[in-house]
Amino acid sequence: MSDILEKILATKRAEVAAGLARVPLAEMRARAEAAAPARDFVGALRAKRDAGRPAVIAEIKKASPSKGVIRADFRPAEIAASYEKGGAACLSILTDAEYFQGSADYLKAARAACTLPVLRKDFMIDAYQVYEARAMGADCILLIVAALELPAMQALEALANELGMAVLVESHDAAELDAALTLRTPLQGINNRNLRTFEVSLDTTLSLLPKIGPERIVVTESGILAPADVDTMRSRGVNTFLVGEAFMRAADPGAELARLFA
């Protein structure tokens, strides 16, 4: 495991402990169970694909460890509405504060400003975070194979499903993908960014494609910056994209989405 990932996970363990001290598990579970029903994340992606359109999970991200602040003028509700107008299928919203300058409040504001299903993009390691995700309004969570042992990953998926949420499982290499494919979720994310080096290569998705059956939805993540990148993926049958930085650097994120996926 990379130094940056290990550092992030240590922060997450501390955050879970602090969260439990602030809001006990039973209370967080009650909040999750009382939340408004989840929106259909997988259904929204399939609807775009069935219509012959690329399904875009548009990301709302202020900063990252590798790039620093990406968007200084950061208004999550306006960005969410812009993405919906631009044709996004779903949203991905960073809630990690320490490394990505994210917030649960950003997720709540963005979800309230549109009708799109929302992914809580964070480093999930504990059941507490899954209850927390549903309580804040998330419709889907991210599970990163590099960050989790298989039994823990399977348990977190089961809990998310029990609460009505979808799961996007993320892998980066063949060994991680083998673990990811043991989960029930159809959403198989392939991160083109190596979390150990932060280098990006679209070949990561293309090389792993043959291992994934047609019943799954392959989500290519990171490095989609130009229409040629989209064309490369679609020509190989990849029609679901998670894109953040290319949109966040544009004056009008939704217009950039519409342009990139025209």
Curated annotation (Swiss-Prot):
It is an enzyme of class 4 (lyase). InterPro entries: Aldolase_TIM, Indole-3-glycerol_P_synth, Indole-3-glycerol_P_synth_dom, Indole-3-GlycerolPSynthase_CS, RibuloseP-bd_barrel. Its EC number is 4.1.1.48. Keywords: Amino-acid biosynthesis, Aromatic amino acid biosynthesis, Decarboxylase, Lyase, Tryptophan biosynthesis. It catalyses: 1-(2-carboxyphenylamino)-1-deoxy-D-ribulose 5-phosphate + H(+) = (1S,2R)-1-C-(indol-3-yl)glycerol 3-phosphate + CO2 + H2O. GO terms for biological process: L-tryptophan biosynthetic process. GO terms for molecular function: indole-3-glycerol-phosphate synthase activity; phosphoribosylanthranilate isomerase activity. Pathway: Amino-acid biosynthesis; L-tryptophan biosynthesis; L-tryptophan from chorismate: step 4/5. It comes from the Bacteria. Belongs to the TrpC family. This is Indole-3-glycerol phosphate synthase. It comes from Thiobacillus denitrificans (strain ATCC 25259 / T1). The gene is trpC.
